[in-house]
């Protein structure tokens, strides 16, 4: 006997056996499909592991009690899913009617504009169409009267319903109806073929309470349809649009409770400074223009000063060369033994020029005096030969010397003197003058020296210390300065334009601020140098 006869039958099939059984089942189903396409549950004994899922699995029967799974034959007991999805509707051309979404919950007579053509104005093909004509006066009056009656009826009903006690409603007028019965004969309807029926509304009791309750909550009607969105089809966003839609988070400039490390660019983006338009004040442009003009003028002034310095250096160089040339010429003439009379002639010409210049000044002075007013003319004539000193030193006699003999005016018209016999003939007494020559106060002291009695209250007892002039004298003087010089003789003499400033101003006026002087100014320069050389 084989060993397999003693072993129990296997409960599980091998892979080969499963494949063979599947192949046989497919063949059987193929054979049965040719006969009948009806699907039925497997017979008893072969339902292990089988679960009915579809409606065809139940066949014509109900649920299988031996299969402990929720079963819904013919979908009985299955909860229906609630959905607000609408069934797709198409129009006569086969296009989907998207306006069904807007028409949901609305009456069929309500006009809803949901197409692009609704936005486009219609073209009037026939101007005489009666639908497009304006109503006449009779139609307007009729419609107005109907509207007024309907509104009055609605308002009266509302007012009457709100009143607690109201009068009885007016009865409608009686209506007469001609009635013809269907059964005609002597036995029916008392032998009458027609009857006239008078119909009257039954009178109502005004104190009768309302029969129907109307205080129930009526469900709210559907809302207004959503506005149709007429836009182009959606397109993919670009990178630039995505970056523009990035909204920076709200970052405080004062609080950071969590202690996060926030980059500076994110903090500035949250601040919103980049979103503000920058308005530049027009004064910045004015300031920049003013600075540019000032810089340009400063450069022009520097360049002009440099030109003036170069011209002065050139003139100095030319003067030095001319001097060296004259010295060389004199040395050559001295060696050759030739006597020159150039200096003598130059000296005579210089004297003649000075005389001409003085006479010209006198004539100009006379013309000015003749043109002046009478009071001013007398004042000029009075101060014509007046000598005004430069300074008045305090307590110092005038050091100016004069060639004229000066007399003391106090000696004249006196009863004493040499003619009176020297004090009555007493030779031993030398008192020719009754008082000292310098005993009286000088005019400068009377002008500038304050009186003690009047100014004592203001300045105090230290008046002598205040009026001393020693405090204005430096303790250590500069080298080369000698304060004990002799007084100058004659009026003050000034040098004539040592720096060439007048000449520079004349050139600037002539050329009108041009950067480079023209050649026409050179003769004037030589003429000015000649005048200066003659005055020297």
UniProtKB/Swiss-Prot annotation:
InterPro entries with a match to the protein in the record: SKI-int_prot_SKIP (IPR017862), SKI-int_prot_SKIP_SNW-dom (IPR004015)
PTM sites of type Phosphoserine: 14, 182, 190, 224, 232, 234, 446, 479, 481
Keyword tags: Acetylation, Host-virus interaction, Isopeptide bond, mRNA processing, mRNA splicing, Nucleus, Phosphoprotein, Spliceosome, Transcription, Transcription regulation, Ubl conjugation
GO molecular function: enzyme binding; Notch binding; nuclear androgen receptor binding; nuclear receptor binding; nuclear retinoic acid receptor binding; nuclear vitamin D receptor binding; RNA binding; SMAD binding
Membrane spanning stretches: none
Compositionally biased intervals (Basic and acidic residues): 470-489, 503-530
Region entry Disordered, spans: 1-46, 209-233, 311-386, 470-536
Domain of life: Eukaryota
Region (SNW): 174-339
Positions of post-translational N-acetylalanine modification: 2
Primary location class: nucleus
Keyword ATP-binding listed: no
Cellular compartments annotated: Nucleus
GO BP of this protein: cellular response to retinoic acid; intrinsic apoptotic signaling pathway in response to DNA damage by p53 class mediator; mRNA splicing, via spliceosome; negative regulation of DNA-templated transcription; negative regulation of transcription by RNA polymerase II; positive regulation by host of viral transcription; positive regulation of mRNA splicing, via spliceosome; positive regulation of neurogenesis
Pfam families: SKIP_SNW
GO-annotated cellular components: catalytic step 2 spliceosome; nuclear body; nuclear matrix; nuclear speck; nucleoplasm; nucleus; spliceosomal complex; U2-type catalytic step 2 spliceosome
Interaction with PPIL1: annotated span: 59-79
Cross-link (Glycyl lysine isopeptide (Lys-Gly) (interchain with G-Cter in SUMO2)): 23, 81, 97, 115, 122, 141, 158, 170, 193, 240, 258, 286, 339, 344, 416, 441, 452, 509
Subunit structure: Identified in the spliceosome C complex. Associates with U4/U6-U5 tri-small nuclear ribonucleoproteins (U4/U6-U5 tri-snRNPs). Component of the minor spliceosome, which splices U12-type introns. Interacts with SKI, SMAD2,SMAD3, RBPJ, RB1, PABPN1, MAGEA1, SIRT1, FOXN3, U2AF2, DAXX and ATP1B4. Interacts with PPIL1. Interacts with VDR and RXRA; preferentially associates with VDR:RXRA heterodimers. Interacts with NCOR2. Interacts with MAML1. Interacts with NOTCH1 NICD; the interaction involves multimerized NOTCH1 NICD.
Similarity comment: family membership: Belongs to the SNW family.
Functional note: Involved in pre-mRNA splicing as component of the spliceosome. As a component of the minor spliceosome, involved in the splicing of U12-type introns in pre-mRNAs. Required for the specific splicing of CDKN1A pre-mRNA; the function probably involves the recruitment of U2AF2 to the mRNA. May recruit PPIL1 to the spliceosome. May be involved in cyclin-D1/CCND1 mRNA stability through the SNARP complex which associates with both the 3'end of the CCND1 gene and its mRNA. Involved in transcriptional regulation.
Official protein name in the record: SNW domain-containing protein 1
Provenance organism: Homo sapiens (Human)
High-level lineage: Eukaryota, Metazoa, Chordata, Craniata, Vertebrata
Gene that this sequence comes from: SNW1
């Amino acid at each position: 006997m084989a060993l397999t006869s003693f072993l129990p039958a296997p409960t599980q099939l091998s892979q080969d056996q499963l494949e063979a059984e599947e192949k046989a089942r497919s063949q059987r189903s193929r054979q049965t499909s040719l006969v009948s396409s009806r699907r039925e549950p497997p017979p008893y004994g072969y339902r292990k592991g089988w679960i009915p899922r579809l409606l065809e699995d139940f066949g014509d029967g109900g649920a299988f009690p031996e299969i402990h799974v929720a079963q819904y034959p013919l979908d009985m007991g299955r909860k229906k899913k609630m959905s607000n999805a609408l069934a797709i509707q198409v129009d006569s051309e086969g296009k989907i009617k998207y306006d069904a979404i807007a028409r949901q919950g609305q009456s069929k007579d309500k006009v809803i504009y949901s197409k692009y053509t609704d936005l486009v104005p219609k073209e009037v093909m026939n101007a005489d169409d009666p639908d497009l004509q304006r109503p006449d006066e009779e139609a307007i009056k009729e419609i107005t009267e109907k509207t007024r009656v309907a509104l009055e009826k609605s308002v009266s009903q509302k007012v009457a319903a709100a009143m607690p006690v109201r009068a009885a409603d007016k009865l409608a007028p009686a209506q007469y109806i001609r009635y013809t019965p269907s059964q005609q004969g002597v036995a029916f309807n008392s032998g009458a073929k027609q009857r006239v029926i008078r119909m009257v509304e039954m009178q109502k009791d005004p104190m009768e309470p309302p029969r129907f309750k109307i205080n129930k909550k009526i469900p709210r009607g559907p809302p207004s349809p959503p506005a149709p969105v007429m836009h182009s089809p959606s397109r993919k966003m670009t990178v630039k649009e995505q970056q523009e839609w990035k909204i920076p988070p709200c970052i405080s400039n004062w609080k950071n409770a969590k202690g996060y490390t926030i980059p500076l660019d994110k903090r500035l983006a949250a601040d919103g400074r980049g979103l503000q338009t920058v308005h530049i004040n027009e004064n910045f442009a004015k300031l920049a223009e003013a600075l540019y003009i000032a810089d340009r003028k400063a450069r022009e002034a520097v360049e002009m000063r440099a030109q003036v310095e170069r011209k002065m250096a050139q003139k100095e160089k030319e003067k030095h060369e001319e001097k060296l040339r004259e010295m060389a010429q004199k040395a050559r003439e001295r060696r050759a033994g030739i006597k020159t009379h150039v200096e003598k002639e130059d000296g005579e010409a210089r004297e003649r020029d000075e005389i001409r210049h003085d006479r010209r000044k006198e004539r100009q002075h006379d013309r000015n005096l003749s043109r002046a007013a009478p009071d001013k003319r007398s004042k000029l004539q009075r101060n014509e030969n007046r000598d005004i000193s430069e300074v008045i030193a305090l307590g110092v006699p005038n050091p100016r010397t004069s060639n004229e003999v000066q007399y003391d005016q106090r000696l004249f018209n006196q009863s004493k003197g040499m003619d009176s016999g020297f004090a009555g003939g007493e030779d031993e007494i030398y008192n020719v003058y009754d008082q000292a020559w310098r005993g009286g106060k000088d005019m400068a002291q009377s002008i500038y020296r304050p009186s003690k009695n009047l100014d004592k209250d203001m300045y105090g007892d230290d008046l002598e210390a205040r009026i001393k002039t020693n405090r204005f004298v430096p303790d250590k003087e500069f080298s080369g300065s000698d304060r004990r010089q002799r007084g100058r003789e004659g009026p003050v003499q000034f040098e004539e334009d040592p720096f060439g400033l007048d000449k520079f101003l004349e050139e600037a006026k002539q050329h009108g601020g041009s950067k480079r002087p023209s050649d026409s100014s050179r003769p004037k320069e030589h003429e000015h140098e000649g005048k200066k050389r003659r005055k020297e």
